[in-house]
C-alpha cells in the first residue's frame, strides 16, 4: 500500500545581490561536484534575466545505459527519498539496492507500437514521475522540486531502435540533480534568494540544511574572489576526429542520398579536441564574447559541460499548457569594418542575402515543418501554429534565421512526454528525423554524448525549459570536446558547409584558448 505524499518543507532566505553569477558560482561552489549554473538573457539587448544555481543536490539521477537509472543520495535529505522509493516501487520496476543508491531497470520498449501506446509505455522518464508522485508541494512554491541537468543526444536510443555506437565519453544518457539548495538571482529586480528544499522530517537534517542556508547568506555578504587564472597547458594543439577532407566526403555521400529521395536534410557533425584545465574561466570568456539566451555550466563528478546556446530545445509552461519549439537554421557573420566595428549597411545587406537565399530558406522551412509535425503528435487538435516565421536574431558575431512553433499540450500528457516525443531536435538531426539519425550514426560511428541533446530544468509544478546543447564544450580528464555540424540539403555546397561547421566551433575554441592564455 502506497503512503500518502510527504509534504516538502521550503526554507527561503534573502541574500545580497551580485551582478556576476559566474563569480558567485566560483565563490560558493568552487570545484564542488553535482553543481549547476543556468543563465538566461534577452536575445536583442543581451541583458541578463535570471540565473539559477544548484549549490547542493539531494540526489544525482543518471542513466548510464539503456533502460537503466541510477539514483544516488548526496545527503541524508536525499536518502529519505530513496527510502520512500524502496518501499513503494518494488512491484513497478526491477530494483537493485545499495547503501546510498538504487538502480532501477525498466523494460525495453516494444517494437511496432502505435504512437499513442508508445508515449504511455513505462520508460526511464517515469523515475522522475515516481519521485514527484510521493511528494506534495501544498503551497505551489516555484522550484520546490527542481531537477536541473542534461539530456544527451543518445538518450533517443531508449525510445527508438537505432544502431549501437561506440561510447568514447562517460557522458550518461541523462544526468539530473534534484536541488537541495538553490540560489535564484533575478537580474532585472536585482534580488537574490536562497531556497532549501527538505524531503525529510528528520530534525537534525533540517538543522543542517538551515545552517547551510545561513552559511551561503554569510558568504554572499563578503567580497567575492575573482576566478583564479591557472598556468598555461603544456600541449595546446587543436585536433579533430576527422579532417576537412573526410568531413567534406561525408557531406557529399549524404547529398547522394538526398538526391535519391531517402532524406530531405541531415546534420552531420565532427569533434574538435583541446586541453582545458580551467573550464569556469573558459565559460566566463565565452559568456563575454558570445552572450546568448541560454548559458550553462554543469560540474559533474565525471565531466564538466559549459556553453552559450542560441537555441531553445523544448519549453513548456504548465499554467497555460503551451509547448514551444524554436528552430534555428541559417547563419551569417555580422557585417563589420576592418577595425571590428559594426557596419550597419553591410550588416543589413548580409541579412537581406540570408533572408532571400533559396538554400537557407529551403532548409529553414523544412525544419519549421518538422517542428509542426513533432507538436502535432502531442498537442490538442487545432492548437498548433507558427507564431514567428523566418525572423532574424542577431548576436555579437553572427545572425540566425529563427521561427517559433507553439501548441497546447494534450491534457493527459506532461512535459517529459513532450520531450520524449520531440527529441532530438530537427535542427541537429534532419528530416525525416529517424532516418536522418540512422545515417548520422552510420557516418559518425560514435555516440554524440551531450552535443545535440538538451540542458535545462523541469519542476514538480510541470514546467520545463531547455536549450539545445550547442556552442558548448564537454570536458573530461582536462580535454574539451567541441562538436559542431552543418545542415545539409540538396543544393548545399560541401566546402561552404565545412567552413560553417568550423565557424560554429570557433567561438568556444577561442574562449578556451583565451582562458588558458594560448592566444
Curated annotation (Swiss-Prot):
One of its GO terms (biological process) is L-tryptophan biosynthetic process. Mg(2+) binds at residues 363, 500. This is Anthranilate synthase component 1. Its EC number is 4.1.3.27. It comes from the Bacteria. It catalyses: chorismate + L-glutamine = anthranilate + pyruvate + L-glutamate + H(+). Its cofactor is Mg(2+). One of its GO terms (molecular function) is metal ion binding. Belongs to the anthranilate synthase component I family. Pfam families: Anth_synt_I_N, Chorismate_bind. The keyword Isomerase does not apply. Part of a heterotetrameric complex that catalyzes the two-step biosynthesis of anthranilate, an intermediate in the biosynthesis of L-tryptophan. In the first step, the glutamine-binding beta subunit (TrpG) of anthranilate synthase (AS) provides the glutamine amidotransferase activity which generates ammonia as a substrate that, along with chorismate, is used in the second step, catalyzed by the large alpha subunit of AS (TrpE) to produce anthranilate. In the absence of TrpG, TrpE can synthesize anthranilate directly from chorismate and high concentrations of ammonia. Chorismate binds at residues 330-331, 451, 471, 485-487. Heterotetramer consisting of two non-identical subunits: a beta subunit (TrpG) and a large alpha subunit (TrpE). Keywords: Amino-acid biosynthesis, Aromatic amino acid biosynthesis, Lyase, Magnesium, Metal-binding, Plasmid, Tryptophan biosynthesis. PANTHER family: AMINOBENZOATE/ANTHRANILATE SYNTHASE (PTHR11236), ANTHRANILATE SYNTHASE COMPONENT 1 (PTHR11236:SF49). Pathway: Amino-acid biosynthesis; L-tryptophan biosynthesis; L-tryptophan from chorismate: step 1/5. Binds 1 Mg(2+) ion per subunit.
Amino acid at each position: 500500500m502506497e503512503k500518502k505524499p510527504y509534504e516538502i518543507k521550503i526554507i527561503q532566505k534573502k541574500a545580497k545581490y551580485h551582478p556576476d553569477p559566474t563569480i558567485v558560482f566560483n565563490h560558493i561552489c568552487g570545484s564542488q561536484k553535482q553543481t549547476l549554473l543556468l543563465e538566461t538573457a534577452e536575445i536583442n539587448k543581451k541583458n541578463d534575466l535570471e540565473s539559477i544555481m544548484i549549490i547542493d543536490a539531494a540526489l544525482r539521477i543518471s542513466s548510464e545505459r539503456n533502460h537503466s537509472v541510477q539514483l544516488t543520495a548526496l545527503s541524508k535529505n536525499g536518502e529519505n527519498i530513496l527510502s520512500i522509493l524502496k518501499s513503494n516501487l518494488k512491484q513497478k520496476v526491477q530494483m537493485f539496492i545499495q547503501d546510498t543508491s538504487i538502480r532501477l531497470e525498466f523494460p525495453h520498449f516494444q517494437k511496432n507500437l502505435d504512437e499513442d501506446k508508445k508515449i504511455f509505455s513505462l520508460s526511464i522518464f517515469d523515475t522522475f514521475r515516481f519521485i514527484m508522485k510521493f511528494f506534495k508541494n501544498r503551497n505551489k512554491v516555484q522550484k520546490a522540486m527542481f531537477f536541473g541537468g542534461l539530456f544527451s543526444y543518445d538518450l533517443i536510443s531508449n525510445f527508438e531502435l537505432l544502431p549501437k555506437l561506440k561510447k568514447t565519453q562517460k557522458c550518461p544518457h541523462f544526468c539530473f540533480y534534484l536541488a537541495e539548495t538553490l540560489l535564484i538571482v533575478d537580474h532585472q529586480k536585482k534580488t537574490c534568494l536562497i531556497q532549501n528544499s527538505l524531503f525529510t522530517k528528520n530534525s537534525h537534517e533540517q538543522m543542517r540544511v538551515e545552517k547551510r542556508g545561513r552559511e551561503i547568506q554569510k558568504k554572499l555578504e563578503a567580497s567575492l574572489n575573482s576566478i583564479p587564472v591557472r598556468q598555461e597547458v603544456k600541449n595546446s594543439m587543436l585536433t579533430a576526429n576527422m579532417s576537412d577532407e573526410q568531413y567534406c566526403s561525408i557531406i557529399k555521400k549524404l547529398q547522394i542520398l538526398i538526391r535519391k529521395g531517402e532524406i530531405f536534410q541531415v546534420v552531420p557533425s565532427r569533434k574538435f579536441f583541446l586541453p582545458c584545465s580551467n573550464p569556469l574561466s573558459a565559460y566566463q570568456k565565452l559568456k563575454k564574447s558570445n552572450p546568448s539566451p541560454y548559458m550553462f555550466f554543469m560540474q559533474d563528478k565525471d565531466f564538466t559541460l559549459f556553453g552559450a546556446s542560441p537555441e531553445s530545445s523544448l519549453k513548456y509552461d504548465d499554467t497555460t499548457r503551451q509547448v514551444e519549439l524554436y528552430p534555428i537554421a541559417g547563419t551569417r557573420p555580422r557585417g563589420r569594418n576592418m577595425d571590428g566595428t559594426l557596419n550597419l549597411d553591410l550588416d543589413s545587406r548580409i541579412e537581406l542575402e540570408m533572408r532571400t537565399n533559396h538554400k537557407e530558406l529551403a532548409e529553414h522551412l523544412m525544419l519549421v515543418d518538422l517542428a509542426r509535425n513533432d507538436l502535432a503528435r502531442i498537442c490538442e487538435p487545432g492548437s498548433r501554429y507558427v507564431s514567428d516565421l523566418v525572423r532574424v536574431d542577431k548576436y555579437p558575431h553572427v545572425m540566425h534565421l529563427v521561427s517559433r512553433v507553439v501548441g497546447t499540450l494534450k491534457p493527459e500528457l506532461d512535459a517529459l512526454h513532450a520531450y520524449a516525443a520531440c527529441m532530438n531536435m530537427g535542427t541537429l538531426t534532419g528530416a525525416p528525423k529517424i532516418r536522418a539519425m540512422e545515417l548520422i550514426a552510420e557516418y559518425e560511428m560514435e555516440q554524440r554524448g551531450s552535443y545535440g541533446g538538451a540542458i535545462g530544468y523541469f519542476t514538480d509544478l510541470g514546467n520545463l525549459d531547455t536549450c539545445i546543447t550547442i556552442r558548448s564544450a564537454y570536458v573530461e580528464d582536462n580535454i574539451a570536446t567541441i562538436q559542431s555540424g552543418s545542415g545539409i540539403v540538396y543544393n548545399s555546397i560541401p566546402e561552404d558547409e565545412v567552413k560553417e561547421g568550423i565557424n560554429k566551433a570557433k567561438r568556444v575554441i577561442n574562449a578556451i584558448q583565451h582562458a588558458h592564455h594560448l592566444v
